[in-house]
Amino acid sequence: MNDFPWLTIIVVFPISAGSLMLFLPHRGNKINKWYTICICILELLITTYAFCYNFKMDDPLIQMSEDYKWINFFDFDWRLGIDGLSIGTILLTGFITTLATLAAFPVTRDSRLFHFLMLAMYSGQIGSFSSRDLLLFFIMWELELIPVYLLLSMWGGKKRLYSATKFILYTAGSSIFLLIGVLGISLYGSNEPTLNLELLANQSYPVTLEILFYIGFVIALTVKSPIIPLHTWLPDTHGEAHYSTCMLLAGILLKMGAYGLVRINMELLPHAHSLFSPWLMAVGTIQIIYAASTSPGQRNLKKRIAYSSVSHMGFIIIGIGSITDPGLNGAILQIISHGFIGAALFFLAGTSYDRMRLVYLDEMGGMAISIPKIFTMFTILSMASLALPGMSGFVAELIVFFGIITSQKYFVISKILIIFVMAIGIILTPIYLLSMSRQMFYGYKLSNVKNLSFFDSGPRELFLSISILLPIIGIGIYPDFVLSLASDKVESILSNYFYG
């Protein structure tokens, strides 16, 4: 057990500091904004410092563990810890939340509440990634939903209430399955109920019961991933949410579902996962094609980007279903990669909306002349999204391909079919991304309108865009920086399938 409660501080600090902001005298929106940014930067620095000095990359076991008694009757403790699977997502959360707070500068209405909700969401997300107790994971999972609902319903577009209601119905409804699974798995096979993830990882179940647990967790976790047909809340939510909220949704929220699939379904229920992995592969493959085919038909700019997120999440599902070292490593790398790329695209879509107040692509055109900096950044990040070599998306998708090829679980004809369908999806990706850029920036539609002028990116927006672009290029050039964090943990998880 760790001597100093680093993880408790990292989890509790954002929401505690945010609560303090609600009681401070109202001194104007700028004070609230800079206070929140300072909290996020300080949190990120504390997290980075704690991990640099306490995390050992060659140790697949839980590190920096903390265990404080809470409710003895349920064996419910405040258990926190990190490993190679969670460290990358925690750092991603800190980085994206800090930039999303900076992106939220134009928000002026109820600024204190808005920034408090962002900090509360920050705590919930880090708590989910660092929980070593199944019920604590569920509580953090739910804690993070409330700020998203309020951010969407209070600072969204014209249909924000519809989108917020749809979001909460999907996510809260699926959480019922998560709660049933948590209670069922903790009560089974032991005289005393246990919620400790490390103990549950060594627990065996009857095949039928393990399958039932697996299905319950899959329904709960894949709503957030999201997997078709449970994805329909996502385009509506992205279409109406403020773009700083979209950055948090695309960059972090979707990754929580994928993280849960690895942490719970793969690690706790290996036999059921082995049975259901072909279905995950099939759904992931269909998802890539379906979302890539649906995206070009979306008039709303943010909805088109949302469908591209659904398509890219298909690669993560395939990597998880492959049950191979390259496949799972590729899925983890894609979680980090798409966290940056998705957040960046939504930020640029939002800054474009701030200037022209248009959301439909068929009303845009000719913006490249007026806003060349935004045009350049949007083009570069679109290239990153379509997996251009040298960018993080290319490496992640390539490693997932290797995972399918090297899988011993599937017949050659099945692997060829999966790769062929994935290749079609990869071909469709530049079609909808490049057509989106063409509709926004080329032509003469807006450039011919008299007395219409746009301001290009200011220092804040340019700094934010470059800050997201640098890790995308960095991971694309040197992916081992991320892969080395999780490689030992991946081997430890997969040992349950080949040696367990």
Swiss-Prot record:
MF-aspect GO terms: NADH dehydrogenase (ubiquinone) activity; ubiquinone binding
Database matches in InterPro entries: NADH_Q_OxRdtase_chain4 (IPR022997), NADH_Q_OxRdtase_chainM/4 (IPR010227), NADH_UbQ_OxRdtase (IPR003918), ND/Mrp_TM (IPR001750)
Locations listed in the record: Plastid, Chloroplast thylakoid membrane
Catalytic activity: a plastoquinone + NADH + (n+1) H(+)(in) = a plastoquinol + NAD(+) + n H(+)(out); a plastoquinone + NADPH + (n+1) H(+)(in) = a plastoquinol + NADP(+) + n H(+)(out)
Membrane topology, record value: Multi-pass membrane protein
Gene Ontology cellular-component annotations: chloroplast thylakoid membrane
GO BP annotations listed: ATP synthesis coupled electron transport; electron transport coupled proton transport
Keyword field: Chloroplast, Membrane, NAD, NADP, Plastid, Plastoquinone, Quinone, Thylakoid, Translocase, Transmembrane, Transmembrane helix
Family classification: Belongs to the complex I subunit 4 family.
Protein name (database record): NAD(P)H-quinone oxidoreductase chain 4, chloroplastic
Organism per entry: Draba nemorosa
Gene name in the database record: ndhD
